[in-house]
Curated annotation (Swiss-Prot):
Keyword Kinase in annotation: no
Keywords: Late protein, Viral genome ejection through host cell envelope, Viral penetration into host cytoplasm, Viral short tail ejection system, Virion, Virus entry into host cell
Residues covered by region (Disordered): 32-52
Origin species: Salmonella phage P22
A GO-annotated cellular component: virion component
Subcellular location: Virion
Its job: Inner capsid protein that plays a role in viral DNA ejection into the host cell.
Record protein name field: Internal virion protein gp16
Main location per the UniProt record: virion
Amino acid sequence: MKVTANGKTFNFPDGTSTEDIGAAVDEYFAGQASAAETQPAEQQEEPQQPEQSLMQRAGDLLTGGQSAGQIAEQAGRGLVNIPFDVLQGGASLINAISQGLGGPKVLDDVYRPVDRPTDPYAQAGESIGGYLIPGAGVAGNMAIGSVAEAANQQGDFAGNVAKNAAVNLGAQGLLSGAAKLVGRGITAARGEIAPEARQLIDTAESMGVKPMTSDMIKPGNAFTRSLMQGGEGALLGTGGKRAEQYAIRSKLLGDYFDRVGGYNPDDIVKSMTSTVGGRKNAAGAVRDEIVNRMGSAPVGTTNSINAIDTNIARLEKLGTSADQRLLTALKNLKGELNSGNVDFDLLQQHRTAFRTNVQGDAMVFPNQAKAATNMVENAMTRDLRNAVGKSLGPQDAAKYLKSNSDFANIYNKVLNKRISNTLNKARSEYTPELINTVVFSRKPSDIKRIWSSLDNKGKDAMRAAYISKIAEKTGDSPAKFITEVNKLKAQSGGEIYNTIFSGRHMKELDALHDVLRQTARSDSANVVTQTGQALANPVRLGAAIPTLGKSLAAEAGYGLAMRVYESKPIRNMLLRLANTKPGTPAYERALNQAATAVRPLLANEATRQ
């Protein structure tokens, strides 16, 4: 397989990976640049006085000797080509990988306005660039950015050289990264950011959170993760932005907790009592309306008398072992019904009084008495229903039967007996723990029963209960919040979450959860506080003095490179690339935009620092 890059044709075995092609091409050009630096310079005409060595001229430049101004100007003039070398190196690598994949040549050759300098002072300028940036010996002129402007900048020339070289070192790294992105292959159809990514970015930015590139394009292996982590701790790197991101996310979480409000268990009990009580009153109103229409019409009591006689006979067989309270109540009721003139309303009153007389002051209804009471009550209800059917018709009879049942058992019907008993006990004893056993039930059926019995205030209290429970476990930690929300979503297949957080409340929580999850790197980023960073930088500056700034400039270049990579423009360009089909005009435009945007962005970051 043949690959042409920067006028040089390479032969690779079929099946060679794009990563290996890129590495080989990069290594070849780096070697050429290193060899060129080691070749002896052209012989100059011998001056009348001994000529200074290259490093002596570099020393004059650093110490500000008598000819420093002239040296700086000539060094700057000699270095004017370096930004074009950087772009050409990146373009060659991108083209090599693209062609290795069978694609077209993506970028044209970069125009170089000036031949390689031979002036010794210009060479001294290049040497200073390489001296301050250890990486220059490997990457050659591709690694060193344009420092020609250093001659016209305010301040120390050597310091400006270090900063500008750091800028261009970052540019070279980003271009290489863009080339590798091409080599991995990108699948999509249009030169736009994917809709789901755009929506997430818009949502995050509306909340004040700025997603970084590595938030949207996750590092895929240990090496790329280490690059990201290194950038967070490097001088002029992304640590400050990560710390700012974390602070905003924590504030978002606190604001959400405040907006939802605290949880008061009594609000839920009152809401259910009010709602269910309203249903009971409605059922009672239907029943009362039928009673009024029935008036004083006489009612047959055949079913009632038969049920009473059956239970009296059973009790009398027991002799002295029989429940005397129940036996007396049955005989008294039979006497009242046999007295005649029993109308509809009077039969209803007898039914209510009978249960009260049998139960008395007992907290628990005796099983034998309960069975007999239910049998007699049901018989009396049949007599009442038959009377309504004869006087008002079958529809009113059915309506009466339902309203009567709802009035007597509304709590058990709406909530179920277990929940109703628990809430009744909690209300009488005011124990939040009992209420919480119902509110935080792990049974979706219980939650749905409760939810349907709540008014809007009660539903707000129910949501507050769950959010308050999450807040207790998470504090102001977005990472813990994400974990707890994930647990709630997974509980009972999501039925409980979908019931409590429906509609706009679900959209709000989901949006917050998605933004915090997408930017979760700031929770574990290797960042330091402003005080720590302020102490760290003087230490780094002091440590860099013995090496004349080598380590400092290299770290600054790396930090700036990662800072720009994580910026909004580069993030959007790479997302656009990730959603664009290779070889299309839209792809070429997106790639060119990414390449040409790197240099000014890096320079701007350096200026801001």
